[in-house]
Swiss-Prot record:
GO molecular function, one term: zinc ion binding
GO BP, sorted A to Z: lignin biosynthetic process
Enzyme class: oxidoreductase
Top-level taxon of origin: Eukaryota
Protein name as it appears in the record: Probable cinnamyl alcohol dehydrogenase 1
Record InterPro entries: ADH-like_C (IPR013149), ADH-like_N (IPR013154), ADH_Zn_CS (IPR002328), CAD-like (IPR047109), GroES-like_sf (IPR011032), NAD(P)-bd_dom_sf (IPR036291), PKS_ER (IPR020843)
Physiological role: Involved in lignin biosynthesis. Catalyzes the final step specific for the production of lignin monomers. Catalyzes the NADPH-dependent reduction of coniferaldehyde, 5-hydroxyconiferaldehyde, sinapaldehyde, 4-coumaraldehyde and caffeyl aldehyde to their respective alcohols.
Gene3D superfamilies: Medium-chain alcohol dehydrogenases, catalytic domain, NAD(P)-binding Rossmann-like Domain
Family: Belongs to the zinc-containing alcohol dehydrogenase family.
Cofactor(s), by name: Zn(2+)
Organism: Aralia cordata (Udo)
Biological classification of the source: Eukaryota, Viridiplantae, Streptophyta, Embryophyta, Tracheophyta
Amino acid sequence: MGSLEAERKTTGWAARDPSGVLSPYTYTLRETGPEDVFIKIIYCGICHTDIHQIKNDLGASNYPMVPGHEVVGEVVEVGSDVTKFKVGDCVGDGTIVGCCKTCRPCKADVEQYCNKKIWSYNDVYTDGKPTQGGFSGHMVVDQKFVVKIPDGMAPEQAAPLLCAGVTVYSPLTHFGLKEISGLRGGILGLGGVGHMGVKLAKAMGHHVTVISSSDKKKEEAIDHLGADAYLVSSDATQMQEAADSLDYIIDTVPVFHPLEPYLSLLKLDGKLILMGVINTPLQFISPMVMLGRKAITGSFIGSMKETEEMLDFCNEKGITSTIEVVKMDYINTAFERLEKNDVRYRFVVDVAGSKLDQET
């Protein structure tokens, strides 16, 4: 264990206003406590939620803001009470960096549903300092919210699993779908989360149908990701033929869309699981749910326990995310491309290999 300092400075890339443009920003990290891990960041994935935050789409953004919550790095120092990690470990940190540890969700190891959870960025830590994310040189994180990256897993591949991976893994396990081989599942939307949904559901032995508004991703879905079928939601004939065929649908679409067409695809007792962050009320008519005893539910990222399970599952099954690695000075272009769905399927920033204090 090295000597922990009360204050350290690091440089990240921050948004200053709702334009969402990021540029170098040097700031002071929070004080390192006895249960904290000091991490040198190596890679950080880019998530669509980062766009919502830097552009104040949800109306709660505070600036300057360093985004990034798919963080993989190396442990540089550990606090005196840290028991889970040692210097040199390759570790990850996701969306949450704090919780109350006393409420019902916390005691049930689903701390992501704690009403007092602390986000990895755009939040305030218990010491009053703003939290800043993974597009930076270093982070200080409570050991509870850090996971070990399994041996043999490439760190750049691990980064998207900490959000996109566990976001899909959590409902598949919570709703008992993981253990039932042969289920017929639908993945609505083939982006960063959706492509992980295909890979994870297939590894669980499910028959997977990708649902998209056009056929432009059909070859990719079937030939490269291993989906069993592809359904074009704008084709009325295809949708009618697929009625009552799916046990569940994982809806990853982050923009407003009608639910009725997808409810019609579900079998009796089927589940429509919402995952996209949408700031517009969704609509459906109640008979679409009542007449098939169908359920519309949601799921939010995953717990630390689920994250550890998911990483082990992916390592065992050889599941990786499909990524494009970029340097930090490309991040604004990467955000622009992500908004246009011009990425296959997740950007990962090579933080350690970037000059954080320089713009192009």
